[in-house]
C-alpha cells in the first residue's frame, strides 16, 4: 500500500503558530520577507567543498533586499560542526542562527517563508505539501523524487542566485509525499488485514 509520508501528518495535527508569534519568539520583523535555511554537509565531499558551499550561500543571502533568514544548524555528519561555526560567525539582525526550532516552530515558520534554501530533506518532503518554493543546493538529496516546487542547483554563488530568481514561479503545491492522512491509512490497512486474517482463520 502507498499511504504517503507520515511526517506530513504533522501539518494537520498541529495548530501552526501565527506570523506575529513567530516574529516575537525569533526576534524577526514581520513586515520583512523571511527565508528558511538548512545546509547539511555533503559527506562524500571535502571539508573545503562544504565550507565553500556555505560561503557561497551566505554571499547570496546578504545580497537579498528586505529579507531576514533563519538558519537551523547542520546535523552531526562530517563537516557539520564546521558549517555551524561558520554560521555562528555570520549571525546578525537579518541572519538568525538556531540549533533547532523544534517541530511546531519549524513547520510554522516554513509555512510563512518565501522559500526554503539548502539541502535538507524537509525541503524535499514537507515543503511541497505547503507549496513553498525550495532551492535545493548540491547533491545531498540526489536520487530522491523532486516535486514541482523544488529548484535544484549547483553550489556556486551564481547558480544559487539564478535559482532564487525563479522562486516566484515555484509556489506550487505537490502532494506526491501524501495528503496528511498517512497515519490514518496505515491504521486502517492494519485493521483490514487483521480482520481478513480472522475471517480466513474461521
Regions found by a protein language model. Name each.
Residues 166-202:
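C-terminal amphipathic helix plus adjacent low-complexity
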Residues 52-66:
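Short hydrophobic signal-anchor/transmembrane segments that target glycosyltransferases
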Residues 1-3, 98-99, 151-156:
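Short acidic-hydrophobic, aromatic-tinged amphipathic segments that line or gate anion-handling sites
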Residues 102-146:
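A donor-sugar binding/catalytic signature common to diverse glycosyltransferases
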Residues 65-100:
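Catalytic donor nucleotide-activated moiety binding site of glycosyltransferases and closely related
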Residues 128-172:
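Nucleotide-sugar donor-binding patch of glycosyltransferase catalytic domains
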Residues 1-50:
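A nucleotide-sugar donor-handling region in carbohydrate enzymes
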Amino acid at each position: 500500500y502507498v499511504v504517503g509520508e507520515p511526517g506530513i501528518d504533522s501539518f494537520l495535527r498541529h495548530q501552526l503558530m501565527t506570523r506575529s508569534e513567530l516574529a516575537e519568539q525569533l526576534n524577526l520583523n514581520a513586515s520583512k520577507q523571511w527565508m528558511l535555511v538548512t545546509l547539511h554537509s555533503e559527506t562524500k565531499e571535502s571539508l573545503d567543498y562544504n565550507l565553500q558551499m556555505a560561503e557561497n550561500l551566505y554571499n547570496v543571502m546578504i545580497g537579498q533586499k528586505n529579507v531576514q533568514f533563519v538558519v537551523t544548524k547542520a546535523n552531526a555528519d562530517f563537516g557539520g560542526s564546521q558549517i555551524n561555526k561558520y554560521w555562528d560567525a555570520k549571525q546578525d539582525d537579518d541572519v538568525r542562527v538556531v540549533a533547532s526550532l523544534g517541530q511546531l516552530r519549524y513547520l510554522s515558520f516554513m509555512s510563512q517563508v518565501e522559500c526554503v534554501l539548502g539541502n535538507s530533506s524537509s525541503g524535499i518532503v514537507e515543503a511541497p505539501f505547503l507549496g513553498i518554493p525550495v532551492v535545493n543546493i548540491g547533491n545531498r538529496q540526489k536520487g530522491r523524487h523532486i516535486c514541482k516546487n523544488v529548484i535544484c542547483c549547483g553550489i556556486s554563488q551564481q547558480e544559487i542566485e539564478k535559482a532564487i530568481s525563479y522562486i516566484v514561479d515555484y509556489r506550487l503545491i505537490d502532494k506526491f509525499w501524501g495528503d496528511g492522512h498517512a497515519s490514518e491509512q496505515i491504521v486502517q490497512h492494519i485493521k483490514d488485514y487483521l480482520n481478513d486474517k480472522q475471517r480466513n482463520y474461521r
